[in-house]
């Protein structure tokens, strides 16, 4: 997304890079400014003009709650509140997506994990924190009608961590029970394992208000590839949702999104904006000197602060 090399491929490492470059105080000011400007009401208005009716909001547990999940970070949640207010004003439903759970649910850069391990499924400390975090989020938004549902975990467990697959549904059940203790209203959205493509973990319905989510990138957008999801939709009588798709060309988009519409599958595009791209709705121009930052990130070489 930010055209940075692998050593600096996740939020915590990018944050360290910025702090090393400008110092802790200026880094704090930078991130406050970034979070205020990266997504604004203008973005939400543009989403509505383009015909979208939902926004999937990725949340990082490290940013929105204390490490144990007991308390939410009010400064961070105020930004979520503000985004929800904008969405309400423009008729855009909000899906709250725990993209980076305590400990990491994927064990790769996308979950902001520290050691490239899905520690959420290795250490009960993180499981308990995740349950508490979701209960607090649900309690905060239980009366917010523009929130469509809670996407409990983004893309848990790629295939090389399949040994933990049998731990996903029990954790989903625990989170759902915690949410339902404070919120009976909102949908519970469950993703399969292996980049949200494998639904074999769904052996029982754990709630009466479920949505099952899959992600689709790169491979052919054809009916055959969607049949497993359609069969489960019909068998369980639940909505299904293509929660992430993109990173392709316009021909792929046209075929995929038309097919989803024809089959009654709701979908979201990933991602709304990124740097120097031709395959997202919005592209960010790289700022002057960004190539030097990327080079320093890749080689660990210091940069002068000017």
List where the protein language model places each region:
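Active-site mouth of glycoside hydrolases
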Residues: 1-187, 192-200
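Extracellular glycoside hydrolase catalytic/binding regions
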Residues: 131-274, 279-295
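Non-catalytic C-terminal accessory domains or segments of carbohydrate-active enzymes
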Residues: 290-306
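Low-complexity, flexible helical/coil segments
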Residues: 16-30, 90-96, 224-228, 245-252, ...
